[in-house]
A protein has these predicted regions:
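N-terminal helix-turn-helix DNA-binding module of bacterial transcription factors
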Residues: 1-58, 72
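Amphipathic helical "hinge" segments at domain boundaries
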Residues: 45-109, 114, 194
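Flexible loop/hinge segments that line or gate small-molecule binding clefts
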Residues: 121-166, 183, 242, 267-279
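Hinge/beta->alpha junction and helix N-cap segments in small-molecule ligand-binding domains
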Residues: 65-75, 93-101, 153-163, 179-201, ...
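Flexible loop/turn connectors
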Residues: 230-237, 242-319
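Short, well-structured alpha-helical segments in soluble
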Residues: 101-114, 218-232
Length: 319
């Protein structure tokens, strides 16, 4: 395969002349014709990444994702990709495994890689996150969390929780168990939980609250430990669909998958509708969140005004 030096030698010009031609710079008509012919004859493909680094925009977008094999992440990324294709961006993914240090390093790595913008799907925002973001020379969009003065796309977590709490209370369920996550995640650990509590409180219902993990396997262990001696429960709530599925798994292993109780989750994961009985879930439009994030990031890249915070409504499934 020919490189830029080979093309320069064949044309009898310098490498800088070839580079100038490839980047749309000024060269003589004769040289332009000669280079066009040689490049076509030898099917020369310039290094697009190297070219992009010399240009004002690289057409590279960095997305920092917290989990793999996640319905929420998968759908959000699909939304991002759909808009990237419209604007000829290339998407780079950095998986952090819910590790805060890895998220910080990913922000710095993408900045050094000269991406045009960054989409951060964070579960927690620390002071260090904010310090790094403030120093970056590229726009950043948050998805799933919000913070003053940062552009963000969020789901209406409080309303989602309130809907579930109100639904359970209206059915006269009194013995309610909720498996939540750490309050370090403000959206799920604080807002969603508070919505549930407030919705139940309307009916004078106060749930038993346990702390667990976003990770399905860890949630299964926590659920098993807390429910092994429990009885008479009317409703069980998982802060996410994977946690709700962990609850369902526990009862199915107890040969009580169709007992006199109802399980609720959040996210709209298709798996919740494949189990028996189906789990009642609040559906979040993750794909739309991805498209909104990328469209707003594109506006910021070109110094246009973008909405500071977008709240996406939730939908109810199997109520």
């Amino acid at each position: 395969m020919k490189n830029i030096s080979d093309i320069a030698n064949l044309a009898g010009v310098s490498k800088s002349t070839v580079s100038r031609f490839l980047n749309g710079g000024s060269v003589s008509p004769q040289t332009k014709e000669k280079l066009s012919r040689i490049i076509e004859e030898h099917d020369y493909q310039p290094n697009q990444f190297a070219q992009s680094l010399r240009a004002k925009h690289t057409n590279l977008i960095g997305a920092i994702i917290p989990r793999m094999n996640s319905h929420a992440v998968d759908e959000t990324v699909k939304g991002i990709v759909s808009v990237c294709h419209q604007h000829q961006y290339q998407l780079l993914l950095n998986y952090t495994g819910l590790d805060i240090r890895a998220e910080i390093e990913a922000l710095e790595t993408f900045s050094r890689s000269k991406v045009d913008g960054i989409i951060l799907m964070a579960t927690t925002l620390t002071d260090e996150h904010l310090e790094v973001i403030e120093k970056l020379n590229v726009p950043v969009i948050l998805v799933g969390q919000s913070y003053p003065n940062l552009h963000s796309i969020i789901h209406d977590d409080y309303q989602a929780g309130f809907i579930v709490g109100e639904q359970i209370g209206s059915k006269k369920h009194k013995n309610v168990v909720f498996f939540g996550v750490s309050e370090e995640d403000v959206a799920v650990g604080v807002k969603r939980k508070q919505g549930i509590i407030d919705g139940l409180k309307k009916y004078d219902v106060y749930p038993e609250i346990y702390l667990t993990s976003f990770k399905y396997e860890e949630a299964k262990n926590d659920v098993s430990e807390k429910l092994k001696n429990a009885s008479g429960i009317h409703a069980l709530i998982g802060a996410t669909d994977p946690i709700a599925l962990a609850i369902h798994k526990f009862y199915s292993q107890q040969n009580n998958a169709t007992g006199n109780y109802q399980i609720f989750g959040f996210g709209g994961n298709p798996m919740t509708q494949l189990v028996t009985p189906a789990i009642t879930t609040v559906k979040f439009n993750y794909f739309k969140a991805g498209t909104y994030a990328m469209n707003q990031l594109n506006e910021l890249i070109f110094s246009k005004n973008a909405v500071s915070k977008t709240v996406i409504p939730v939908e109810i499934e199997n109520f």
